[in-house]
Amino acid sequence: MPDIRIREVGVNELGLLLSWREEVLRCVFSLPENADTSALMQANEAYYKSAVPSGTHIACFAQKDGETIGCGGLCLHDEMPSPDNPSGRCAYLMNIYVREGYRGEGTGKKIVRYLIGCALERNITKIYLETSPCGRTLYESAGFSEMRDMMLLTYGK
């Protein structure tokens, strides 16, 4: 496995965070190059400026030979404590992305393991995510399983 380093990113690298977030959104949502993402990116900027310093979002980059090749994020939040999550602490794994040309080298797995470790260091054991069919194997290999009994309500789609 190549030498891939995962590092946490702060708002001091906001420009890079936003650049990667836009790349992820364009790829995952198949947005055309000419799609206007300015309002969405302003919302992401406000989110990062608030959530990263407050510790409710952990962002990381994967680097190979000093080049950033991937990213990931972890949104931390509370829910009502329950028997399956007595602390009520939760982590939502998101924005896991590796640039084409660097996929298949274990980078995604390293990003996921790093972020799981960040959650566990904070005693958060309820970690969940949404996945695409191409990401399912990665997440299953990290120990994630299908969530049953969940539903989603969306408006305006």
Which residues does each predicted region cover?
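Conserved beta-strand in the GNAT
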Residues: 61, 67-76, 92, 97
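Conserved acetyl-CoA-binding loop of GNAT-fold acetyltransferases
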Residues: 140-150
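Conserved acetyl-CoA pyrophosphate-binding loop and the N-cap/start of the following alpha-helix
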Residues: 102, 106-114
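Conserved beta-strand-loop-alpha-helix junction that forms the acyl-donor binding cleft
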Residues: 127-137, 152-156
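Conserved N-terminal entry element of GNAT/NAT acetyltransferase domains
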Residues: 1-15, 157
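Conserved GNAT-fold acetyl-CoA-binding loop/helix
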Residues: 25-47
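A short helix-loop-beta-strand connector motif used in the catalytic cores of GNAT acetyltransferases and
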Residues: 46-61, 92
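Conserved GNAT acetyl-CoA-binding A-motif
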Residues: 112, 119-131
